[in-house]
């Protein structure tokens, strides 16, 4: 083996060891239950040796020498050993399963906590299905590696040590015959470990892909049905399910080979022992020795199969710990500004997405006064949404500065900064909960019913809420599926109204409403915007004619700015957009 290959192998071993030690730390939190399980396992393993010693004693003293006293004791001795074995087995299994469920819970909590602290860019790059697979399937595999593998390793290792020790006691020379096959077995298992690890990792990846396809197909059912995508989605799922089956079978093949090789090597050892033992032992010693050798095969096979589960668990651990170790949002600011007056300044701001060929925003400079209503218009991809995303720091400025009330947003804590904003986006986000909990969401959860009703009325949502079966306590389904598009939009606006933040971010806030609803909601928004800074993204220019200033964006730059009348008089890009919509 070359030095490079050897270095990689050593690094892989160290990485696996570090992963497993980190995983065991989760189990170590519950060391009392873990210790109880280990003690029970020691007791369980000791009964195996006790059982063989009893067989030897009874065979020699009972069946050979016809000692009736010991023959009468045999049933009680066997029952006692089996009773102790059964009790120890129950305690060890229950205690380890209890620890396993705690480990799964802690892993999921840590993973979800980190998930909630990651930047928006992470969620833009990773699908919900892959994340879901990490939180569900991968954490279960990790728990198995941390508890079941540890439990079986302790139990079977102790059993092997007990059996080998007893065999050495009976005849150390004969025991060495078994030791001859041990190096071959160890070499084979070591050579299989990388294959098991890579197969386990492939299984994790295909599980993530499968969850992703399911999540997309289920959440997009209306689109799937209207465009006849059922067969296409079925083909996608069949393809990824086939990949998963292939990887699972590959893993099973390696595991089966392990078991077969262990059986063959054990058969060689058994044949050699029988060949050399004939005529050298008493009947009891021979029965005990062969019994010990046979009882070795099971634990050795279990340990080899554990290698599969261990490698799958380590592959899962790498996946989950990679997420847990992801860098959270930068939150190094310490300034707390209370309620902002609402001034906004962009100074030489530039941002380019990692995979983009040109900047999304390029050298932006503008100022918004407190209480001013700014409208952003322009063709899709012009940078309007990116600009808005910089204000609450969904993305970080790469060049330049963004200031709120004269304070760089990077110098504020994220909590203080985001308290200044209410957001209504084009993609309305509602949760599978009640109307009340969707309006009084997050930091608003302690709002009174009177305040929620007032916000609903201001958003022209109260009339339809009253008509729901349970009013504010009505469940609205996944992503608000039981409501119309306009109703969902109005709930989102009610949520923004209830927050009563000094700065409003409205991204196509009325795009899903019919003409009558739009008129009512626009009136409510106009009233809400009084004395508040508002930034509105709109394609429907009729909704922003009364804006204090309209900024036209093109390829990340502001190419025009002014009031509605001023821009029409300029007869530039805005005037062309306006004529397209109204003529």
Swiss-Prot record:
Membrane topology type: Multi-pass membrane protein
Task: Please indicate if the UniProt record lists Coiled coil as a keyword.
Answer: no
Which reaction equation describes what this protein catalyses?
Answer: ATP + H2O + lipid A-core oligosaccharideSide 1 = ADP + phosphate + lipid A-core oligosaccharideSide 2
Q: Which CDD domains match?
A: ABC_6TM_MsbA_like, ABCC_MsbA
Principal localization reads membrane
Summary of the function given for this chain in its UniProt record: Involved in lipopolysaccharide (LPS) biosynthesis. Translocates lipid A-core from the inner to the outer leaflet of the inner membrane. Transmembrane domains (TMD) form a pore in the inner membrane and the ATP-binding domain (NBD) is responsible for energy generation.
Q: What is this protein called?
A: ATP-dependent lipid A-core flippase
Species of provenance: Methylobacillus flagellatus (strain ATCC 51484 / DSM 6875 / VKM B-1610 / KT)
Per the record, the gene is msbA
